[in-house]
């Protein structure tokens, strides 16, 4: 006699923290170039994963479905007839539908790097005896980005850098190990700003030859310096270059 009751399925799908985590896993597993993602292949593999989840009657979080729609949209743009070079507008000449996705993936790597560093610091703290934590003052405000500059503005600037990096990077390059962490990069940036009191453009912190690790470490360092009020950001208008300055009190502290 057949037992009609379904047995509960035990499967570890929580290996991935979200759609970007899954995409990064697929890119690494297939040794794909994050700056030149074969969109048809990655879309098919991503959809195959979702189909397998459905086959096992597992719930799929909404953000996974949103990413699936995004991948399909990018794929469809590649299937459309492309304009001839002489018919392209200057503004769209270097537009690649993957740019925004690549920037999101690299930004996600930023948070992975930061989470890894926090875990290491937490483990190191467990090796020491510490006094009881003091209560946080009620009037202590959460760190914010400079007034007028939002996280979206920084991410937009980051996407522009990714697009430029993809266009101008060499086809082959010698890989040089860079082991700098976020704290060290923060020190480098503040030192650079001490020698440039007039400030510098956000884009000038990112060299074309830098590794992906340096790219995300630099981005995270800028976020941290801004949140700590060591660095001020200015932007004349939306999507215009973001300028960094060392705050006056920080400059005086160094003299």
Swiss-Prot record:
GO terms for cellular component: cytoplasm. It comes from the Bacteria. Its main location: cytoplasm. InterPro entries: ScpA, ScpA-like_C. GO terms for biological process: cell division; chromosome segregation; DNA replication. Pfam families: SMC_ScpA (PF02616). It is found in: Cytoplasm. Keywords: Cell cycle, Cell division, Chromosome partition, Cytoplasm. Transmembrane segments: none annotated. Belongs to the ScpA family. Participates in chromosomal partition during cell division. May act via the formation of a condensin-like complex containing Smc and ScpB that pull DNA away from mid-cell into both cell halves. Component of a cohesin-like complex composed of ScpA, ScpB and the Smc homodimer, in which ScpA and ScpB bind to the head domain of Smc. The presence of the three proteins is required for the association of the complex with DNA. This is Segregation and condensation protein A. It comes from Lactiplantibacillus plantarum (strain ATCC BAA-793 / NCIMB 8826 / WCFS1) (Lactobacillus plantarum).
């Amino acid at each position: 006699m057949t037992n009609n009751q379904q047995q509960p399925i035990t499967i570890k799908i929580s290996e991935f923290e979200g759609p970007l985590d899954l995409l990064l896993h697929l890119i690494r597993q297939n040794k794909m170039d994050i700056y030149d993602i074969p969109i048809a292949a990655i879309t098919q593999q991503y959809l195959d994963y979702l189909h397998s989840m459905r086959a096992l009657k597992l719930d799929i979080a909404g953000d996974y479905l949103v990413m699936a729609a995004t991948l399909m949209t990018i794929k469809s743009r590649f299937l459309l007839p492309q304009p001839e070079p002489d018919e392209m507008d200057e503004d769209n000449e270097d537009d690649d539908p993957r740019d925004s996705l690549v920037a999101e993936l690299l930004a996600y790597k930023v948070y992975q790097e930061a989470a890894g560093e926090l875990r290491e610091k937490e483990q190191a703290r467990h090796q020491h005896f510490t006094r009881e934590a003091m209560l946080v003052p009620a009037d202590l405000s959460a760190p914010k980005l400079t007034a007028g500059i939002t996280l979206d503005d920084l991410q937009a600037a980051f996407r522009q850098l990714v697009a430029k990096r993809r266009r101008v990077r060499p086809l082959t390059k010698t890989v040089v190990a860079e082991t700098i962490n976020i704290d060290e990069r923060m020190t480098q940036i503040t030192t650079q700003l001490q020698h440039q009191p007039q400030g510098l453009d956000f884009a000038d912190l990112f060299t074309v030859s830098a590794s992906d690790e340096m790219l995300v470490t630099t981005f995270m360092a800028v976020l941290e310096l801004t949140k700590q009020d060591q660095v001020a950001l200015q932007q004349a208008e939306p999507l215009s270059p973001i300028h960094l300055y060392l705050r006056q009190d920080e400059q005086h502290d160094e003299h």
